[in-house]
Design a protein with these regions (language model features):
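Strand-loop microenvironment adjacent to phosphate/nucleotide-handling motifs in alpha/beta enzyme folds
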Residues: 1-194
Length: 194
């Protein structure tokens, strides 16, 4: 058990977004170092954009960008993208995919993934909510804080669709409210302090 904890000691940064999230992801990645020492997982609940992110985002970071597949190893200094119509979980340092649990209405893939992290990841957790409709992710933020994680919302006036950041802020469980550029700086500060 001790060996697994040492292996999984690096942080995971979950970045959840939807409509308008692409701009936020780009601004964030452009300001993160390539040797950050954390895994970046982008959980976008807008299905059509999610499938294209692994093609678009490599233009904005030198970190490898991968579309998540079943049992893909989680590695630091990589950007991972959730595939469409899937719930994402972690288990034994791997990603696990399941059929989406909420196929109608607004999906809750961000909430599902963050809850899995709180139960199955030993390293530091940093959860970021950026531009998007609805309130996906907000319900899991207090759980992230309960396990010692850090929560960040995009400053609503810097988001093209502020619903998701506003819902996150309304949860009462947000540590920082920042622009994407400042989110990147804060993530770097947190990871370096670990």
């Amino acid at each position: 058990m001790k060996t697994q904890s040492i292996v999984r000691d690096f942080p995971i940064v979950c970045v959840g977004g939807s409509a308008g999230g692409l701009d936020s992801y780009i601004r964030l990645l452009q300001n993160l170092p390539d040797d950050l020492g954390a895994a970046i997982v982008i959980v976008n609940h807008l299905r059509t954009v999610a499938t294209l992110l692994h093609e678009i985002l490599p233009r904005h970071t030198k970190m490898p960008v991968e579309l998540i597949t079943e049992k893909l190893d989680i590695e630091p200094n990589h950007v991972f993208i959730i595939p469409e119509k899937r719930d994402l979980h972690v288990l034994n340092r791997e990603f696990r995919l399941k059929p989406i649990s909420k196929p109608r209405g607004w999906p809750d893939v961000i909430t599902v993934f963050m809850r899995s992290l709180t139960e199955n990841w030993d390293g530091k957790l940093i959860s970021v909510i950026v531009s998007g409709y609805d309130g996906d992710g907000a319900a899991a933020l207090c759980g992230i804080k309960e396990v010692g994680g850090i929560t960040i919302a995009q400053k609503p006036d810097t988001a093209s669709h502020p619903d998701m950041p506003e819902s996150a802020i309304a949860s009462g469980c947000i540590d920082f409210v920042l622009s994407p550029e400042d989110i990147a700086r804060e993530i770097k500060r947190i990871v370096l302090a670990i």
